[in-house]
Design a protein with these regions (language model features):
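ATP/NTP phosphate-donor binding region
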Residues: 1-22
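Short coil/turn connectors at secondary-structure junctions
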Residues: 25-29, 52-56, 86-90, 95-96, ...
Length: 189
């Protein structure tokens, strides 16, 4: 695919998942380069679509293009390559010398090389002067056989609760064609 990541749709996630599942048969690790605007969404989707993936699948990208003299792309690719070579199965996001679980990475900054954070879970690895420092105890064990689950429901609405939100939004959602509503509520305190 050669697509601006802001244009990616669930159909592309399905295509990426299918191609990755096929490639798992012949490779020991896979690196997927991706634009940063939606990379976290793709990493999360792949985490749930590639159930029990037997090899490392690592997504990475860069804030500055590869041809830019100060690009972060080479460092991010090295980080992704180190994780892909680790042999540890799972879907991961590698960025700014950190490796996080694919379902935990979130883009939190639009500029700056530290654009991604692992939310409510520490990074599972870091690249340091000593190489890739893995925290294996943080990586969930693969307990199921590999299978591709590429059926997606796109009729889900994400609602972020905010102070002053008009409760009438719930009536509108009930009248819509959505099959599910995910409510991003306030924290626990």
């Amino acid at each position: 695919l050669s697509l601006d990541s802001s244009n990616i749709q669930p159909e592309e996630w399905q295509l990426i998942a299918r191609q990755t599942a096929e490639a798992c048969r012949d490779h020991d690790g896979i690196i997927i380069t991706h634009g940063t605007d939606t990379m976290a969404y793709t990493a999360s989707a792949l985490t749930y679509m590639l159930r029990g993936v037997p090899i490392p699948v690592v997504l990475t990208g860069s804030q500055l293009p590869l041809v830019h003299p100060l690009s972060d792309a080479p460092d991010n690719l090295r980080c992704a390559a180190a994780m892909a070579a680790s042999g540890i199965p799972g879907v991961f996001l590698a960025f700014d010398r950190k490796v996080m679980l694919g379902c935990r990475g979130v883009k939190v900054r639009t500029s700056g090389f530290d654009a991604f954070e692992s939310i409510n879970y520490p990074p599972v690895a870091r690249v340091t002067g000593a190489g890739l420092e893995l925290h294996r105890e943080l990586i969930p064990a693969q307990t199921e056989d590999f299978r591709l689950e590429d059926g997606l429901c796109t009729q889900v609405f994400l609602l972020k609760l905010t102070p002053g939100l008009d409760p009438g939004i719930f009536d509108l959602l009930l009248q819509s064609n959505y099959r599910g509503v995910l409510i991003e509520a306030f924290g626990a305190g």
